[in-house]
Amino acid sequence: MIIVGDIGNSETKIYLIDSRNKVVKKISLNSKKINHTLIKKKFLIFNLKNIIIDKCLFCSVVPKIFDNINFFLKKYYKIKCHELKKLKLNLLLDIKVNYKQIGSDRLANAIGAINNKDNFIILDFGTATTFDVLVKNIYLGGVIAPGVNLSLNTLSDKATLIPKINLKKTNKVIGLNTISAVRSGFFWGYAGLIDNVVNLIKKETK
């Protein structure tokens, strides 16, 4: 069995995977609320006392959470976890930018896209919206923009008259009230952002 995890600013997901690369069990945690008690409670789902863990690998953009999970697994189950950026990734990927400045989540996305044939622009919608560029298995860098939900929540937190809003597609650009106008701004605004950035990257990598 293998444990793999993705520790993000908003959410942490941890998976138990069998020898056929099939997800057996999954844990989801709010990254803002993670503590020792919660980690201990959630990992009971994996029933780790009765199985053998061959490897444990995380990609993490919150070092403190990784350290806490690694400490817990090592103390209670003698399982040592590795963080993606600490591995020798140059054996898989030719990285042409400052390695220390790239998040583990973005590197994981790039590694997942390697196939020796195609070039990729990889989009990831999380706390941040990221674009990463892979050409002939060479990681060229990317773009980081504010995430949709982060921006939407910040707007409602800072603007007194704008309520919490769930993002939905709007058929028309012009909103008829505050809520539909905000939805339109975010839906069409981010659609335009994505189209524009993707097109600019394509031009820059021709």
Positions of the model-derived regions?
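Acidic-glycine-rich active-site phosphate/pyrophosphate-binding loop
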Residues: 79-91, 127, 161-170
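N-terminal glycine/serine-rich phosphate-binding loop of ATP-dependent small-molecule kinases
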Residues: 1-3, 7-89
